Every structure is written in structure tokens, then in C-alpha cells.
Amino acid sequence: MDAQSYLKRIVYRGSVRPSIDVLRRLHVRHLLSVPFENLDIHLGRPIILDQELFYNKIVRDRRGGYCYELNGCFAWLLRELGFRVSMLSARVAGKNGGFSPDFDHMTLLVRLEEPWLVDVGFGDSFTEPKLLDSTRPQLDSGELYRIARKNRETVLSRWDEIGVWAPLYSFTLRPRKLEDFKARNRYQQTSPKSHFTKRRLISKLTPNGRVTLTDRKIILTNGEQRSESPVRNSKQFDGLLTKYFHLSFE
């Protein structure tokens, strides 16, 4: 495992001395370079919680992954560069107003002069680290985010188009180890109730928007413009996978 190869993978150049400016740039470059994807689950390849395996997949094979892989690997890079990083357990907000079980999502806490929420593994979410500050909303790529304490947890929310704070996930600040996520990682890739087993998904931030591909459709956003087109068969899916993500499994 080599930090310089990782930096090359995310096309990062410049200082790596721990600071909020460097953290912001690393975060954005990671999102622009490494997709969120669950393709291994549908290829019958088990996802094992091991940082060297994450590194090989993301850096050497130029793939992506889901939260445990992406944030687990990014945590390794940040520590190699001298950042103080903790893995946190998060519970994803559901449509019914509740939250999923513990360890359903992994997010990161980076401590500089102030504590920052870092997450390169939650798909379409914030692009820059968020200050753990419950007193004011934080603007990010035209979206407002808020981090607020609720009982014993902290909740990340986004200002919705209907004019309410919509929770994304809740988390505690207790540091966790990679193996703590083992049971939930197994569930995510094997349970028929897991949304990761229901369909293939790959999504990546672009300089002006996002590209998202599933078994059923491809969605392209560019600024205020959004287009959605059906995916009719596996051959078309494979072609789009190569065109937009430079991946092929032939």
C-alpha cells in the first residue's frame, strides 16, 4: 500500500500537510475520481473488510466501492498523511422517519483544530467536509446542510426542496474499528432486503454534476440540467459502464 499511488489515483497534486484546505481538496478529488458502486455484489465477489483489499480494488484496479470500502480506504490514506481520523457508525434515515440499525453506514471524523465530518462513501451527498457545528447551516454546491445534536446522536440533514430539513443519517462520535462493521457488511451484500442486492448501481461526482447508472436507467446532471434515459439490456449497461466509468468486466 502506497500513499503516493493513492494520490495519483485521485489526481491529487500539492501539499499533503494536514490542514482543512488539504482535507477539502483530498475529499473533492476522491469524489471526482472514485465512484460509489456495488458491482462486486452482483458479480458474486464477496466484500471483505480489509484495508489492503480496499486499496487493491480502488487504487490498483481503479474501481470504486461502497461506504465501508471507500471510507475505510480513505481513512487509511488520511492517517498515512498525518491526519487524526476516527471511523464512526452511522444509521441511515428511512422514508418512514426512522433510522436503520447501527453500523449501516460508515462515516469519518477528522480532528484538526476543530472536528470535521468526512464522507466519500454516501453517494449523492456533500462534496466538502462539514464542520461539526450545530449552530449554523453549511452551504455546499448549492445545497444547505446542517449537523445538529439529537438526544445522544448527531444528525446530518439537508434542506429539502419542500422547505424542511431532511435527515440523511445519524451518528455517534464513539470511535469504531473496521471489524465492528463486519455483521452489517455481510447483511448489505447477502440479504434480499438490502437495497444493494436489488440492483446494480454506480455513481460518481463530475465537475458540474453527477453521473449515475443502474440496471434500469442512466441519470446525467450538469448544473441545472438533468437527463434520464432507460437502460434496456445488459449490453447497453456494459457500454455505458465503459463510456462513463471506464470499467469493463469482460
Model region roles, listed by residue range:
Residues 63-89, 108, 202:
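Cysteine-centered nucleophilic/redox motifs
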Residues 229-250:
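Generic C-terminus detector
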Residues 9, 80, 243-244:
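Residues at alpha-helix termini
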Residues 1-62:
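Secondary-structure boundary elements
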Residues 44-47, 76, 95-96:
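Short active-site-adjacent helix-start/loop capping segments
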Residues 1-10, 14, 34-35, 91-98, ...:
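His-Asp-centered catalytic microenvironments across diverse enzyme cores
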Residues 4, 75, 238-239:
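Short glycine-/small-residue-rich flexible loop motifs, especially phosphate/cofactor-binding loops
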